[in-house]
Amino acid sequence: MRDLKTYLSVAPVLSTLWFASLAGLLIEINRLFPDALTFPFFSF
């Protein structure tokens, strides 16, 4: 039961950190390449 409580307290923290970093990454990509349908570093 103690392991379950530890899991339930760790999982929201990790998911919050993950989604916050993912949102920040998407915001920075959209700031550097606004309205980009194709990214210049992918087209060779």
Curated annotation (Swiss-Prot):
Keywords annotated in UniProt: Chloroplast, Membrane, Photosynthesis, Photosystem I, Plastid, Thylakoid, Transmembrane, Transmembrane helix
Subcellular localization: Plastid, Chloroplast thylakoid membrane
Keyword Chloroplast found: yes
GO terms of biological process kind: photosynthesis
Membrane-crossing residue ranges in chain numbering: 7-27
Entry function: May help in the organization of the PsaE and PsaF subunits.
The protein's name: Photosystem I reaction center subunit IX
Gene name linked to the record: psaJ
